[in-house]
């Protein structure tokens, strides 16, 4: 067990609550010690919804354990009386799992009808956020999905959208807009916004859409096996993947339409998918060929995240923006094999699989790519390294839970991603220009002395100033070589001054390459001459 700080995935409780908090009429009771209700604060801070999270805690105290009593039955009664949920999900925390309590027996003593209770007693030490969320949603589908007649006209279920999902509402809106353009109705969206009654009517749809590898795919596979419902698992990230996604959707829907004697759906003009209905649905195809974006073909990108977004973004960056992929990885080991298959031919080396952010930061520092697409962790790491970074998946912070329409799915999503790539890379150039033209008043002086007027100190005379200046310039310490921030090599002042003229977003890479060059020729100190030789040797 590792200390749970800066982990990519949350606990099993976090995954369970993502599903239950997404649904209507579903409440969660955690059998846990005081303090595990931090999850409630997480939702109220990050989730941009007016509803309060449907989460309660059955507190376990030392005195209760000593007396052999449990608060769980009483807590379940209070939840039933106050919230009147259709279903209450009961789950243990890591602490209470050690007690080996029979939660089914405790729940039975609550007096709440058993059909309104569900004990989801997984092992919180072995199961993390995404696996717990996917497992619970699949169990709910198995419990409530009921065989029934299909809808008269083509309809689909959209599965896997959960609370605290990355750009959740915008992605869902993007998919629904595409479906409306095609004339396909949405039967159920679950778990987001769904109810127990909605889960019951899942088999009425013609097709299931499960774009997330992490949550929803197993539920779609169960519905396909039990109710012969075809499923679409492709990820509509990027212009061409979205076109293929629409083609596959129509192919599956029309196959069922022919069997049911319904007229097939024709592919509408691409303009119909645009926001105004008059222009191309995405500006990426022409924007990627502009002079402004042409330079991106030489830029290197590193991508790290969950399975769905890592695969989608790697393909988008290389296929549609022409960037070079210097590496990619994931913190979800259970999906690594699927990712290797999807990214075959895209990566220069092996897929990185780790849940240690330090390992990812080390790779970024070694590669020093022009762009990193990752999580909130990589954003922190890249800030220290002065490497441009854009967040593409959880874990995220408040700035990635937006009120506005910023999808990653569909044609509109392709535009959003392209904009973010462009801005993330170009802002570095802007900062360098501000540094470069600092004398024009575009930056603040870092070590500006306090005002003489404000401090009440009289200005020194020119003679005194000149003496101080002369003594400073004569001091041997003033021109002494300064050690590198990394502590490996020593740089002279003139070499350091020349290095500062290099744009900040490649400065660390230039420093590292110069030091490697100096070691190679046996120079312990980097002077201006050594710096120039390194520049010539490296093709600068």
Curated annotation (Swiss-Prot):
Keyword Signal: no
MF terms in GO: 4 iron, 4 sulfur cluster binding; ATP binding; metal ion binding; oxidoreductase activity, acting on iron-sulfur proteins as donors; oxidoreductase activity, acting on the CH-CH group of donors, iron-sulfur protein as acceptor
Record flagged with keyword Ion transport: no
Biological process annotations from GO: light-independent bacteriochlorophyll biosynthetic process; photosynthesis, dark reaction
Record-annotated active site: 292 (proton donor)
Pathway: Porphyrin-containing compound metabolism; bacteriochlorophyll biosynthesis (light-independent)
Entries under SUPFAM superfamilies matching the protein: Helical backbone' metal receptor (SSF53807)
Highest taxon above the source species: Bacteria
Region (Disordered): 451-490
Residues where substrate binds: 428-429
Keywords (A to Z) from UniProt: 4Fe-4S, ATP-binding, Bacteriochlorophyll biosynthesis, Chlorophyll biosynthesis, Iron, Iron-sulfur, Metal-binding, Nucleotide-binding, Oxidoreductase, Photosynthesis
Amino acids binding [4Fe-4S] cluster: 36
Biased composition (Low complexity): 457-481
Record note on cofactor: Binds 1 [4Fe-4S] cluster per heterodimer. The cluster is bound at the heterodimer interface by residues from both subunits.
Reactions catalysed, as given in the entry: chlorophyllide a + oxidized 2[4Fe-4S]-[ferredoxin] + 2 ADP + 2 phosphate = protochlorophyllide a + reduced 2[4Fe-4S]-[ferredoxin] + 2 ATP + 2 H2O
EC number(s) from the headed UniProt entry: 1.3.7.7
Obligatory cofactor(s): [4Fe-4S] cluster
Family: Belongs to the ChlB/BchB/BchZ family.
Subunit structure comment from the entry: Protochlorophyllide reductase is composed of three subunits; BchL, BchN and BchB. Forms a heterotetramer of two BchB and two BchN subunits.
Its biological purpose: Component of the dark-operative protochlorophyllide reductase (DPOR) that uses Mg-ATP and reduced ferredoxin to reduce ring D of protochlorophyllide (Pchlide) to form chlorophyllide a (Chlide). This reaction is light-independent. The NB-protein (BchN-BchB) is the catalytic component of the complex.
UniProt protein name: Light-independent protochlorophyllide reductase subunit B
Organism, scientific name: Chlorobium chlorochromatii (strain CaD3)
